[in-house]
Regions:
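Glycine-rich phosphate/diphosphate-binding loop of Rossmann-like nucleotide-binding domains
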Residues: 46-66, 160-248
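Rossmann-like adenosine-cofactor binding region
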Residues: 221-303
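Short, conserved loop/helix-junction motifs that constitute active-site signature segments
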Residues: 166, 195, 278-285, 307
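Positively charged, low-complexity intrinsically disordered leader regions
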Residues: 1-58
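Phosphate-coordination loops involved in phosphoryl transfer and adenosine-cofactor binding
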Residues: 35-41, 167-169, 285
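Phosphate/diphosphate ligand-binding glycine-rich loop within oxidoreductases
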Residues: 36-44, 50-160
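Adenosine-phosphate binding glycine-rich loop
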Residues: 285-287, 291-332
Length: 332
């Protein structure tokens, strides 16, 4: 029997997303019992994690399974390229690590969101895709520089809970300032599922902070096919006006991917790109969302993060429920 991986929201149909979120809602309302008794999930984190790590551990335990966590310090430096001459720093090939771990665990989760400085390389998700290629068990994307599908599904679940029907609802996905260049993963994945749901999506960012060209192009086509829309604006106030959801997120620009110092200089003039009470006052009493962690009073102010329209903790809680549903689909 062929295995199923969970690598990208771009691989999902509308029906598959709906089925998974429907299952997540049922799981949230009623504990499913020990349906994964005897199953083991291996999690490999090459970057720090709080919500992803804990929510997957909790999900697996509540389903009766077991979870093993390995961080970057626990792992050898890996070589993802096929037929590489391994006379450099890499101690082990991904092929050997993936095939070995497949003998121990029933599924693997990989977080590999490192920034190499080469966007053309990082957008290929080489480490994640290499694990998926060589592992004989399901591989789950826990975030790369290019995608974060688990976060996006929890985001969509939260929107469904708050607004019920999503088709035509106005989502503003807004770039916010941050002292570091962050992954585009949450932005790309949310845009993909929001377009699939037929939402009216406004992507707002300063000039120079465009997302990946292919993701934007496919997102527009998906939105049109689903009865929604996707537009890009470079004015934060115009983007927020009339929004029903404001999703704040920082991301590093592919344009500056090889020059973080230059990006930092550019962002000094963009400190007004944050979500505050004045901006939220122009919306349709919009929900405020953020995937966390958040730089308070840089990306968004305390007043809006702690305000009555904020659903950031509901988002975080729904990570566990979405991931329980995902694990049940992959392993049950």
């Amino acid at each position: 029997m062929s295995k199923r991986d969970f690598l990208s929201t771009a691989d999902l149909t509308r029906a598959e997303v709906d089925d998974l979120l429907d299952l997540a809602s049922r799981v949230k309302g009623k504990k499913p019992g020990q349906v994964l008794h005897g199953k083991t999930l291996g999690l490999l984190f090459f970057q720090p994690s709080l919500r992803t790590r804990v929510s997957f551990e909790v999900a697996m335990v509540q389903l009766g399974g077991h979870c093993i966590n390995l961080s970057n310090d626990d792992l050898y430096e890996l070589e993802p390229q096929e037929q590489a001459v391994m006379d450099g720093a890499a101690e082990e090939h991904v092929k050997d690590a993936a095939r070995t771990l497949s003998r121990y665990v029933d599924a693997l989760g990989i977080r590999a969101a490192a920034r190499s400085g080469d966007w053309a390389r990082d957008r290929q998700e080489l480490l994640l895709r290499s694990y998926a290629r060589y592992a004989s068990v399901p591989v789950i994307n826990l975030e790369t520089s290019f995608g974060h599908p688990c976060q996006a599904l929890a985001d969509l679940m939260t929107m469904r809970e708050q607004l019920v029907s999503l088709r035509g609802r106005k989502l503003t996905l807004m770039w916010c300032n941050h002292p570091e260049p962050k992954s585009l993963g949450p932005t790309h994945s949310l845009l993909q599922v929001a377009a699939l749901a037929g939402m009216d999506v406004t992507l707002a960012h300063p000039l120079g902070f465009e997302i990946d060209d292919e993701v934007l192009r496919k997102g527009r086509a998906t939105a049109q096919d689903a009865g929604g829309a996707l537009r890009v604006v470079n004015d934060r106030e115009a983007a927020a006006r009339g929004a029903e959801i404001v999703y704040a997120r920082s991301w590093g620009a592919p344009k500056y991917w090889s020059d973080a110092e230059r990006e930092a200089v550019v962002k000094r003039s963009l400190q007004d790109w944050r979500v505050d009470e004045a901006l939220m006052a122009t919306t349709q009493n919009a929900l405020l969302m953020h995937p966390l962690p958040v730089r308070r009073n840089v990306a968004a102010t305390d007043a809006v993060l702690d305000g009555v329209q904020s659903v950031i903790y509901e988002q975080a809680a729904n990570r566990a429920h979405v991931q329980k549903a995902l694990l049940m689909q992959l392993l049950k």
